[in-house]
Amino acid sequence: MAGNSQRRGAVRKPGTKKGPTVGSGGVRRRGLEGRGATPPAHMRPNHPAAKKARAAAKAQQQRAGRKADETELVLGRNPVLECLRAKVPATALYVALGTDADERVTESVQIAADRGISILEVPRTDLDRMSNHGLHQGLGLQVPPYAYAHPDDLLATARADAAPALLVALDNISDPRNLGAIVRSVAAFAGHGVVIPQRRSASVTAVAWRTSAGAAARVPVARATNLNRTLKSFADAGLQIVGLDAGGDTTLDELDATGPTVVVVGSEGKGLSRLVREHCDAIVSIPMAGPTESLNASVAAGVVLAEIARQRRS
C-alpha cells in the first residue's frame, strides 16, 4: 500500500518518523487563565457591533447639540403677549396674514416694534408648518437659545459681591414653570444664581422666562455636567450645602444661613436624590401648621430664600 512504511521492503525517508504526541505542557492553558469570559460584541473595540454603537452614540450627541442650539417658537396670543410683556428675548414676531387684530395682537405688535423685534407677516400655511400645526392663533414668537453660565461663574459673581454667596441648585426639577418661579425668587431675595443639571432637568425655555417675569435676564443660570461634583466643588470653596426635604431633621427655624450657602431643591415627585443628599451639610424642613405634607418646589424655595434674606438683614 502506498505510504505504508510498515510493509516489507519499504524505506522511510530521514526525518519523517513521527514521535509520540506531546502537549504544550500547559503553556496554552496558562496563557488563557485570568482572561475571564469573552466580552459582549459591543464591548470589543473592533467588532462591527461596537463600531455601530459608537456611531449611534455620536449621532445622538450631535442631535442633542443641534437641539440645544435650536430656537423656540412660542405659540398663541396670550403666551406671546405674556412673553413680550416679560421682556423675554425674541428675534422675530410672526403674524399670519388675515389674522383678526384684537387687543392682544395689537399690543404684541406694538411691543415688538418698540423693542426692535422683526415683525414678519407670513401665510397661515407657513406658520402652520413652522409650528408643526400647533394652536398658534395667528401669532408666533421666535425665542433664541438661552446662554447658560458655568457654575464657576456663579462663584465668581458671588465673591465679587459684599454679601455672602447665596446660590440655588435644582435636583432634576422638570417643570419649567417651577424653574422660572425659583429664578424669580432668587432675584427677589438677592441670590447670585441658579444651577441646574445638564440632563433630566427643565431648561430655560420661553415658559420659564415668562414665569420668571423677566428675572432670568438678571439672574444667571448655570448648567452642571455633574451636579454632585458641582456641589462638592462649592463645598470645597467654603459654601454650606443645605437640602430641602419635608422629612429633614433640621427645621428652617434652626438653620443658620448667614454664611455662604447653597440651597438644594429636590424634584417635584421624588425630592432629593440619594447622592445629592450625601453632599448636603443639613437637610432642612419647613415647619407647617396644617396637615399639608409638602409645598410645591418653587414655593418651598421661596420660603427658604425669604428666611435667609431675613437672617442676613438682622
From Swiss-Prot:
Alphabetically ordered keywords of this record? Methyltransferase, S-adenosyl-L-methionine, Transferase
An individual GO BP term: RNA processing
Q: Which GO terms describe its molecular function?
A: RNA binding; RNA methyltransferase activity
Sequence positions that bind S-adenosyl-L-methionine: 266, 286, 295
Which domain of life, per UniProt? Bacteria
**Annotated coiled-coil segments of the chain:** none
Q: Which GO terms describe its cellular component?
A: cytosol
| InterPro entries associated with the record | Alpha/beta_knot_MTases (IPR029028), Ribosomal_eL30-like_sf (IPR029064), rRNA_MeTrfase_TrmH (IPR004441), SpoU_MeTrfase (IPR001537), SpoU_subst-bd (IPR013123), tRNA_m1G_MTases_N (IPR029026)
> Where does the sequence pass through the membrane?
none
Q: What is its EC number?
A: 2.1.1.-
- Which family does the record claim for this protein? Belongs to the class IV-like SAM-binding methyltransferase superfamily. RNA methyltransferase TrmH family.
Q: Per its record, how is this protein called by name? A: Uncharacterized tRNA/rRNA methyltransferase MSMEG_6073/MSMEI_5913
